[in-house]
Amino acid sequence: MTATDLQPGAAPEDRPRKGPVLPPVREPRWFDRPVDALADLGQELRFYAQVLGAIPTTLKNYPRDIVRLLSEVSFGTGALAVIGGTIGVMLGMTLFVGSVVGMQGYAALDQIGTATLNGFISAYFNTREIAPLVAALALSATVGAGFTAQLGAMRINEEVDALTVMAVPSVNYLVTTRVIAGFVAIIPLYVIGLLTSYAGSRMVTVYLHGQSAGTYDHYFNLFLPPIDILLSFLKIMVFAVLIILIHCRLGYSASGGPAGVGRAVGAAVRRSIVTVAVLDLVMSMALWGTTTTVRIAG
């Protein structure tokens, strides 16, 4: 006890101040970052499980919102609608990429005297790899980025909190509806994209290089088993659900004002593209890695 404590008339600033004892600052440890990353991954997986688990309830309670989002996914809004929405973007991307496949395939096969097999190149590579990846990129760049921006704007404007206050389950209403709409819409969109990639390859081979249409169609149909088309649709449906989940997650948890929304959109596009590339490798190995549905000889 000091002399100041014994003087009842001491000035308040001279008396010792008693307050909460703050814990000492802990130095960062080497495993903090991996642990934080693991915790973030667990939160994301929990969010995805919550979204997918709410599908039956959402189908029952919000059918009109799902239909509205179906139109938005297919035809877009604002400036995106001017170019035909997601349909227009997918048509353009698959047409030109399919044309490149036909052009490069013909040039490579012509060097060894087997240019007549260019129909095989289109049927094999467009179906298994090229069309699903291009469709996934188009979906991420249009629908996914739009969903991230929408949910991010709602989050920073406190609209998500307002839904919670009104007892509306925000995850069901904002995220699950978008996942359902994207899953349903990707099927006709991918039909258009896959057929357009086939048309691009055929157009280059027949009209640019002058190959007989009958020859091209013969080898194209010969090396296109129906199971490959079904598995191609399986890939793009898995891609679509994963892309929308990633974009909605980052938009739903955006913070930091308009700049934060922009960062969320960029992070969502990067993450979805990398995830699709890794998942494409895994699914291709699982679906076609140990067996083949096409035999060129034998």
Q: Which ranges hold each PLM region?
A:
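Short, membrane-interfacial amphipathic segments enriched in basic
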Residues: 20-68, 250-255
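Selective transmembrane-helix segments that form parts of the transport pathway or gating/packing helices
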Residues: 78, 82, 130, 134, ...
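Membrane-interfacial helix-loop-helix connectors in multipass membrane proteins
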Residues: 97-127, 195-237, 246-267, 290-298
